[in-house]
């Protein structure tokens, strides 16, 4: 039994690709037809690819690995954050800072600084510092939290990355390739599927479509940690549909 149904994918609009003039020929095998200048993705293939991605993530986590969820485009930001938090994994949803993987030691020093300021805010240090200094510290804190908040507990480079739109996240993809990190992600008809170890052909521009697939990947993490299959867990998918239709 598949972890997702064609009905769910259809209702979420996962089948809508890009305009035919904006495409990558390497995605041809995942395209079903063309309608009104838009490519329609073959959802039968997407169902199988969601399964592959699901079990790839489940396998990583079951073996003690960590997953980093990445999606900095507006349509992905909320679901990447909420689903990563739901399954207890890391995320980047604002901006990919160059070197987040390849220069992780430097990133760790910035995370250390973020935690130092958090401690100062919580232990009463802010109350005894000059007002001007506190304002500057709060500004620094806000910026660090925005860019690094989702990875502040990440102690090392993750074993796998789930990415929404590899074309948008090209720096992340390059760094993952350099370090041999497993890449799983949603690729629209304008992407290069060969950049990913496990590709899910689908609409990466619709909030509902992105939420549905990211939620399934979070389910894979939860199943690996709890040993319970979540193939019937459609609540998040339905919630995604309701949110868009509301």
From Swiss-Prot:
Keywords recorded for this protein, A-Z: Ribonucleoprotein, Ribosomal protein
Gene Ontology MF annotations: structural constituent of ribosome
Phylogenetic classification of the source organism: Bacteria, Bacillati, Bacillota, Clostridia, Lachnospirales
Sequence intervals crossing the membrane: none
Entries under PROSITE patterns matching the protein: RIBOSOMAL_S2_1
Record-level GO cellular component terms: cytosolic small ribosomal subunit
Cystine pairs: none
Name the UniProt record assigns to this protein: Small ribosomal subunit protein uS2
HAMAP family in alphabetical order: Ribosomal_uS2_B (MF_00291_B)
